[in-house]
């Protein structure tokens, strides 16, 4: 593997520079004096930001983008061996690193690199940890998998030994990372186009946890199935967190978690508050500016780590009040004719369930969910779970499956989910065309309704288009 000397800036080219992680890494290198160029299939706000920094951008991937003055090429997992730039790199014998290996080498430059992992909640928790450390004057470098308004983007360049990295398990990419501290939020079946089964996923997370050094800290949710096995044979310090449903349960299980939430309440807009306990003793009342019990757990994970690393409770509380959410995480887009339009990235049944349960505490008449399934593999693997989760909405509109990296196998469609929802008495519609979905919603949504566009594809454009009408 090619090893980078970060004291000697070179020319690095990124294939797929518009990706949320790749763009941040490109900006980080540019800030450190490296010559950076990159290509992407299409233009975007992220690409335009890089262009304005002075980074050379190519729209469209072509062999001529690969020149002999390039010293290293970094590429995403989505880039295949038949990619024209990939082939040109091999022809020129230029060293290559995939994004995960490259990021792993970057993390080695920071004594306190932090990896935030889990099937769900990574972006939110990474953002919460980041704001806590910013408020606590840790001056961290931050790489988050979404747009965080508080740092005006997805990357923040600090000048300390602290580096916060969202760490995804897909294709075992986080096993190339080198964290000193880590969070494991949850472990569920996901990315079954790569992992064999849930046991394969559990093994991957255990391997990730074993990468932590003796002086490191692993924060792990105590509600993970068989979490005791997850923390076996670890040399690092292990910190657990969880939520109690009542004071009686907490009193009977004081030693279950190192950090715990109890007496969770919500205001008229669904924003959560709770009592924080540390080692069984009351610490403070925590107020969040986001909705949902899943965000109580996300905030607990962030608190557990930052408090352990020396953050003050005043800074932690102030940061949580400042966190209004990340782009595409229950993001309030606007109001049209009294209809509140929200967008959410949820694309796994557990995420859909958490979002719709949280939405129920938000002021509304009917909850409309416009769902775009993401990948054929995921839709087939969790078909019945999708039906159960989506049934929590009052009315459901299903768009076509967003293929992403996959070919259509021809044996699964959004129409199949609609049929299952109709069987259980739900009001569900399948509409393939986005323009027709918009027309349908304008005709059927009424004043006081909550409209949620949901999915990891381009379904967000429906709400944005409606608000322009």
Curated annotation (Swiss-Prot):
Gene source species: Lachnoclostridium phytofermentans (strain ATCC 700394 / DSM 18823 / ISDg)
CC annotations in GO: cytoplasm
Cell cycle is among the record's keywords: yes
Function: Cell wall formation.
UniProt pathway annotation: Cell wall biogenesis; peptidoglycan biosynthesis
Family of the protein in this entry: Belongs to the MurCDEF family.
Enzyme class: ligase
Main subcellular localisation: cytoplasm
Residues annotated for ATP binding in this entry: 118-124
Keyword Ligase annotated: yes
Encoding gene per record: murC
Protein's UniProt name: UDP-N-acetylmuramate--L-alanine ligase
